[in-house]
């Protein structure tokens, strides 16, 4: 993709159609569900104790691949700071069944099971995850597929990018705020090539992530 986002790259496949009629590419992308599906999920959230009048974070504290998960204890520290600084925010953990669920519940335990975290709220299908996105104020955590879905529903995101993942490719820029924190922000290519992935991840400190998150949330308010 070079310096282009994956969205721009994929839209480029339509360029041969320019011979028929000029194509005006757009940067916006959306996922649509029915109003009934959206209302149904909103009701479910309320039944789980979520106050829809207050901000909600969807936190991606884990991932399918261990190589795409930032240090767990650092994540716990950042979320603890967030809860102290923004006590009115509600937090939902994004996780799949199996190891991801185990990881998410371990993070929940390490946090001390705060009332701000609604650990049992789940989207049980891709369409429900889209529905969830329309109620989220912010997506935060490890970069991954769920972030793209949230972006398509208009949910702003701040993510930690795994080493080797080009954030300009995976964080398309449009009207929805989307920012990433990556090792490439902190060291040049000559330095990074001498480091393995865990060493590159270690460049991303908890203090840096917290300052970025705090500033991002303050801009949203």
Regions found by a protein language model. Name each.
Residues 1-221:
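Catalytic machinery of carbohydrate-active enzymes
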């Amino acid at each position: 993709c070079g310096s282009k986002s994956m969205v721009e790259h994929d839209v480029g496949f339509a360029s041969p159609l320019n011979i028929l009629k000029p194509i005006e590419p757009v940067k916006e992308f959306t996922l649509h569900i029915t109003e009934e599906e959206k209302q149904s999920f909103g009701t479910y959230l309320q039944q789980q104790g979520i106050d829809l009048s207050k901000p909600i974070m969807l936190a991606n504290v884990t991932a399918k691949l261990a190589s795409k998960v930032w240090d767990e204890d650092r994540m716990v520290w950042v979320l603890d700071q967030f809860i102290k600084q923004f006590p009115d925010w509600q937090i939902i953990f994004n996780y799949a069944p199996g190891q991801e669920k185990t990881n998410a519940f371990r993070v929940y335990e390490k946090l001390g099971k705060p009332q701000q975290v609604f650990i049992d709220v789940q989207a049980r299908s891709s369409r429900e995850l889209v529905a969830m996105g329309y109620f989220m104020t912010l997506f935060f955590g490890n970069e991954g597929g769920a972030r793209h879905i949230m972006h398509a529903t208009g949910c702003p995101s701040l993510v930690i990018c795994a080493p080797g993942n080009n954030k300009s490719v995976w964080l398309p820029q449009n009207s929805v705020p989307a920012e990433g924190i990556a090792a490439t922000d902190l060291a040049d290519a000559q330095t990074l090539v001498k480091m393995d992935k865990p060493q590159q991840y270690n460049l991303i400190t908890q203090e840096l992530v917290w300052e970025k998150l705090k500033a991002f949330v303050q801009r949203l308010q």
